[in-house]
Amino acid sequence: MANLIATDNPIVVVGMGLTGLSVARYLANKGANFFLLDTRKDLPKSTWQQVAELQAKCPSMKVDNGSLDVELLTSAKQIVLSPGVPLATPEIQQAKAAGVEIIGDIDLFLAERKAPVVGITGSNGKSTVTTLVGLAAENAGMNVAVGGNIGVPVLDLLADADVELYVLELSSFQLESVKRAQLDVACVLNVSPDHMDRYPSLAHYCQAKQRIYFGAKKIVYNLEDTLTIPPVMAGVERYGFSSKKAVEENEKHVLLNNDTNALSLNGQDVFSVADIKIAGAHNLKNALAALAICDAANIPFAGLKQALQEFEGLPHRCQWVANKNGVTYINDSKATNIGSAQAAIEGLAGQFKNIVLIAGGDGKGADFSSLGKVINQYVSAVVLIGVDAPKIQAVVDPQVMCVKAQTLNAAVKQAALLAKSGDLVLLSPACASLDMFANYEARGHEFALTVAEVSA
């Protein structure tokens, strides 16, 4: 992608979050002429500290916040859009109509990277699978860099010139502005309703996810999820993965062999389900996806086997917290959408006598009907919190006990009263946390702290 760094007209970086600041550092190092904008009037002190450091290094950089200057945007050579700023923003659309090129940090990264890139997206499981693939490569002795939507912004990964493989978690927000991904391996794990406050429909959200496929050399997709099926593209290798569905014989595939209880690649068992340390049916699917990706990316399977045997899961993703009076407490605060919560409930069902679910928060415009069906099938009681608690309650059948709590602290204590020995208290909100907390991590920490207060 030639000449992504314009010199005759200014580049405008929109957004001063983690990604926007990484773009600004990258452009400053290139000696580019650029503006740094943000729509927010009030920015954190830490942001201004980083901006001051950038201005000291790049005095020509201009900064503005509180609104988007249409005249500046429409006269720019390029706009580098941060993931938190929708492509549909009116000022951005005006610039696009004026012929301004709009790109994201992924485009800048791909234009400069020297090593193969694996990109992983999906409504849920992408952080876990990205971590597993990264660990597999590391265990195999490769110099691997992991980042994107998880941890380090992609442009910061370029600092190490000796990287042999990049493994990136990519969100729909990041993929919106990608012109052509051109990944070596591209994977969509699953698609379920999320960010319906940003996308007009599930179809639009799905289209954003599938942008990861365009230009990819190899594609990995979920045979059980029709929304992940890629378009037919000549010369592209396809890998399907599934825990229960058969495939066409001419397609590469990773399946669960029920006869041997093993994960198999193209009909050959690779390793046992018993090798997977992280629990739940949803994590079995994550392992299947990781195996398909490792094969596509030429990562030795021994590295993945070690990762699966040792990896205990990420914080706030179906994380075991405690067992008190025979009741298990699991923190799945990262379940910020319906699909993720459903995966946790279905994946853990059958391992406990009953599930007492804590759910609720900001549903981001989601339709909770499908969640209601899963709750009605697997959950004995629900404690609801947050602004969208009434919407969830509306889809829960009367036979499922449903109570509301004003705080998460109160919800945990209420759930502890409802649970008996052999039961599970599961925090899997199916909602964002911003109506009550700074982020899902803060919500998860509050859950763990309150569990510690519950009488042993």
Curated annotation (Swiss-Prot):
Keywords carried by this UniProt record: ATP-binding, Cell cycle, Cell division, Cell shape, Cell wall biogenesis/degradation, Cytoplasm, Ligase, Nucleotide-binding, Peptidoglycan synthesis
CC annotations in GO: cytoplasm
Biological process per Gene Ontology, one example term: cell division
InterPro entries: Mur-like_cat_sf, Mur_ligase_C, Mur_ligase_C_dom_sf, Mur_ligase_cen, MurD
Entry binding sites for ATP: G122, S123, N124, G125, K126, S127, T128
Enzyme class: ligase
UniProt entry tagged with the keyword Cell wall biogenesis/degradation: yes
Coiled-coil regions listed in the entry: none
Gene3D superfamilies named among the record's database cross-references: Mur ligase, C-terminal domain (3.90.190.20), Mur-like, catalytic domain (3.40.1190.10), NAD(P)-binding Rossmann-like Domain (3.40.50.720)
Pathway listed: Cell wall biogenesis; peptidoglycan biosynthesis
Keyword Nucleotide-binding set for record: yes
Superkingdom of origin organism: Bacteria
Catalytic activity: UDP-N-acetyl-alpha-D-muramoyl-L-alanine + D-glutamate + ATP = UDP-N-acetyl-alpha-D-muramoyl-L-alanyl-D-glutamate + ADP + phosphate + H(+)
Cellular compartments annotated: Cytoplasm
Pfam families: Mur_ligase_C (PF02875), Mur_ligase_M (PF08245), MurD-like_N (PF21799)
Function field: Cell wall formation. Catalyzes the addition of glutamate to the nucleotide precursor UDP-N-acetylmuramoyl-L-alanine (UMA).
HAMAP family: MurD (MF_00639)
PANTHER family, alphabetized: UDP-N-ACETYLMURAMOYLALANINE--D-GLUTAMATE LIGASE (PTHR43692:SF1)
Family recorded in the similarity comment: Belongs to the MurCDEF family.
Protein name: UDP-N-acetylmuramoylalanine--D-glutamate ligase
Organism name: Saccharophagus degradans (strain 2-40 / ATCC 43961 / DSM 17024)
